[in-house]
């Protein structure tokens, strides 16, 4: 399963992400218009075994791909979830060019929502 690059538009959420079962590749993309790293990504492998955590700051998009048969996350968020406030960017945006570790993954499973996201250029998402 791959969860595309998603975010809250009016209520940006910071997330401290930890995996308590399985393994994922977790990604954050900077969407702060005045940032020198706007449109750049950072990713880490998080697993129950390595016990790493990743902080995704507010005004960043967040995505992940599950690398194990199953995975469970724990999030600590800075803002409540607002389902009507969701936005996103296509997971394979060529300008962002996330290097997803997809070796050994036969089929990428995306939600209907994630299939509809446009590129960063097309969506013009900036904070």
Where in the sequence are the language-model features?
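Conserved SET/PR-domain catalytic core that frames the SAM/AdoMet-binding pocket
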Residues: 47-64
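Non-catalytic, conserved peripheral segments adjacent to functional cores
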Residues: 1-50, 68-70, 75-127
């Amino acid at each position: 399963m791959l969860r595309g690059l998603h975010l809250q538009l009016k209520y940006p959420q910071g997330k401290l992400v930890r995996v308590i079962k399985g393994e994922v590749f977790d990604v954050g993309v900077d969407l702060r218009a005045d940032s020198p790293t706007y449109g750049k990504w950072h990713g880490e492998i998080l697993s129950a075994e390595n016990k790493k955590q990743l902080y995704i700051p507010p005004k960043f998009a967040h995505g992940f791909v599950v690398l194990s048969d199953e995975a469970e996350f724990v999030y600590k968020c800075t803002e409540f979830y607002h389902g009507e406030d969701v936005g996103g960017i296509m997971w394979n945006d060529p300008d962002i060019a996330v290097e997803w570790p997809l070796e050994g993954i036969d089929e990428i499973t995306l939600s209907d929502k994630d299939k509809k996201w446009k590129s960063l250029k097309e969506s013009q998402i900036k904070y």
